[in-house]
């Protein structure tokens, strides 16, 4: 009799994706982050669902409903902090996943890579809208400042901002629609993730060497399921340490003050995972230029495949490009730090230099190093 996992129409799909999937034998722990992102997404949807049962998307009661969740709902505090810190873990895994794709040349799978970029934008939009929902000071002013950036678009900017706000300022209509979008987008992300996997399984996974491994594959289960469970345990341990010991470590104290349109916080800033892009935005004194730089800081990932000049796929055997890659990582950490600092000397200059370096590495230095390394191969 045929095994049910190979004959049943539904189970067969799961079997081909997670059990009998032919996988390269040498993929490292850097390939764990895909499955961890799936776990983070499921966690966010589940905790978000329970939070939505008690949350009220109204400017008068939103802040007090979050307080009610933490104080009165049974285990509401842990659900709320799992959701808030789960978002941070989500972005850590997301940036690691993108970084691995850049390091090992996974961007040569163009369909998978492009769907991944769409996923990144969607997750960022979802996280931004989620940050607005508690209706604290930073929620309100963050929403005001970031949505107001769209007014830099010529001709339609002002109308577009009012259309998104649903009025002449961030108010009840804005909060209600942000809640609606924040609720529906994770399900769209789930669908996009399924398409992402579909395209990945068309080509098969890349591996650290960057060479084709079609002749030498092993089944995903049990080898990589065990490996993924180890990564999952590390993720759960880190998240629980964060939630149970320092739940507000990555948050902003200003968000414990109810939103007040008449009082501007001394320093408006987004969540830590957007600070690098926020620093790039602030480094350009022109509003439209800043908005373009902000969008390009993420959209630049789409042109990375076109800038690939090396004969080798990944950076495993390319020391010059490896140095540039780690310079880029250090630069992104610097930008994240600068994004959290006030707009004053010397932070302005450091931010501008770090922004120039960010675009220079990706657009100029990496392609040049690829050409140099090709020449070195001939020696």
From Swiss-Prot:
Family annotation (InterPro entries): Cyt_b/b6_C, Cyt_b/b6_C_sf, Cyt_b/b6_N, Cytb/b6-like_sf, Cytochrome_b, Cytochrome_b_C_euk/bac, Cytochrome_b_N_euk/bac, Di-haem_cyt_TM
Topology in membrane: Multi-pass membrane protein
Binding, a ubiquinone: 201
This protein's record includes keyword Acetylation: no
GO cellular component, one term: respiratory chain complex III
UniProt cofactor note: Binds 2 heme b groups non-covalently.
Membrane-spanning intervals of the chain: 33-53, 77-98, 113-133, 178-198, 226-246, 288-308, 320-340, 347-367
Listed cofactors: heme b
The entry's keywords: Electron transport, Heme, Iron, Membrane, Metal-binding, Mitochondrion, Mitochondrion inner membrane, Respiratory chain, Transmembrane, Transmembrane helix, Transport, Ubiquinone
Organism encoding this protein: Panthera leo
Function: Component of the ubiquinol-cytochrome c reductase complex (complex III or cytochrome b-c1 complex) that is part of the mitochondrial respiratory chain. The b-c1 complex mediates electron transfer from ubiquinol to cytochrome c. Contributes to the generation of a proton gradient across the mitochondrial membrane that is then used for ATP synthesis.
Family statement: Belongs to the cytochrome b family.
Residues that, per the record, bind heme b b562: 83, 182
Note: Heme 1 (or BL or b562) is low-potential and absorbs at about 562 nm, and heme 2 (or BH or b566) is high-potential and absorbs at about 566 nm.
GO MF term list: metal ion binding; ubiquinol-cytochrome-c reductase activity
Protein name, entry field: Cytochrome b
Record CDD domains: cytochrome_b_C, Cytochrome_b_N
PROSITE patterns named among the record's database cross-references: CYTB_CTER, CYTB_NTER
Binding site for heme b b566: 97, 196
